[in-house]
Design a protein with these regions (language model features):
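Alpha-helical scaffold within the catalytic cores of cyclic-nucleotide enzymes
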Residues: 84-98, 119-163, 188-199
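Catalytic strand-loop-helix junctions within cyclic-nucleotide turnover domains
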Residues: 112-123, 163-181, 200-203
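Regulatory cytosolic signal-relay segments
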Residues: 2-54
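Intrinsically disordered or compositionally simple regulatory linkers and C-terminal tails
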Residues: 43, 147-148, 241-244
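Short, surface-exposed loop/helix-turn segments at secondary-structure junctions
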Residues: 151-154, 175-187
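Catalytic NTP-binding/metal-coordinating core of nucleotidyl cyclase/transferase enzymes
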Residues: 46-130, 183
Length: 244
């Protein structure tokens, strides 16, 4: 009798452990592909199209300068190796500073630093800027000492990025078709951040910060003046960390 009861308890325990292990594996996979916040929501069943919430956040939009030229000159495997090294620098910096990487689009990266994840709005802005500066530093180190798989690429050139940081309200949730959803952020603030990033090359800066983000920061910044953005009614003031 007692042995049979013990066997029964062991089966129940194994079943419970198995379910927990499956959930953990599923959580790890979702976190890897969607990010921690989005992955957690999907694991909890938030998979209805349109489900989500408005959030205030510092929005990060970045891309790789010269991507079109590189993609035309390099083979597919070489381009993938280069992008992986590049995204390792940028996404790693975002995650190091408690940001949420939402998606990679070609050479582009979309990330957020939700205010709710930080003690203050200032802390979120400081984290986003620290991540941007770390990403640029890591790219510099990559260019100076490329790993063997990058150094072996004949036609590669030093990697440069443009990063825009903007503050605004976005909708964080499921968008897409009934059979294919994407957990992302949308809204005017995302569009504005993308327009700002497009100015980084012409302004000669790797990091551009909008007035909305700069207002949270207590550190010297270069004032780059006001700039018109396509699709945005009023010109927007832009700032950047001082050049070294």
């Amino acid at each position: 009798g007692e042995f049979a009861q013990l066997q029964h308890l062991l089966k129940l325990f194994a079943l419970h452990v198995g379910r927990q292990l499956q959930r953990r594996i599923a959580g790890d996979v979702l976190d890897t592909y969607l990010g921690a916040a989005a992955g957690g929501r999907v694991l909890d069943g938030l998979i209805k199209r349109g489900a989500g919430e408005p959030i205030r956040s510092v929005i990060w939009v970045s891309d790789l300068r010269g991507f079109t030229d590189l993609s035309e000159r390099l083979s597919g495997p070489d381009m993938i190796a280069l992008l992986n090294a590049y995204f390792g620098c940028l996404a790693g910096a975002v995650l190091d500073h408690r940001g949420e990487v939402l998606k990679f689009i070609g050479d582009g990266l979309l990330a957020v630093f939700p205010f709710a994840s930080f003690a203050t709005e200032k802390a979120a802005a400081e984290a986003a800027l620290a991540a941007a500066e770390q990403a640029c530093d890591q790219l510099d180190r990559l260019n100076a000492m490329p790993p063997a798989e990058i150094a072996a690429i004949a036609d590669w050139h030093p990697l440069r990025t443009g990063i825009a940081l903007h503050d605004g309200e976005v909708f964080f949730g499921n968008v897409g078709a009934p059979a294919r959803l994407d957990f992302t952020v949308i809204g005017r603030a995302v569009n504005a951040a993308s327009r700002v990033e497009a100015l980084s090359k012409s302004l000669g800066r790797s990091i551009l910060i909008t007035e909305a983000v700069a207002g949270h920061l207590d550190r010297p910044l270069d004032d780059l003046g006001r700039h018109a953005l396509r699709g945005v009614a009023q010109p927007i003031a832009l700032f950047s960390p001082p050049l070294a």
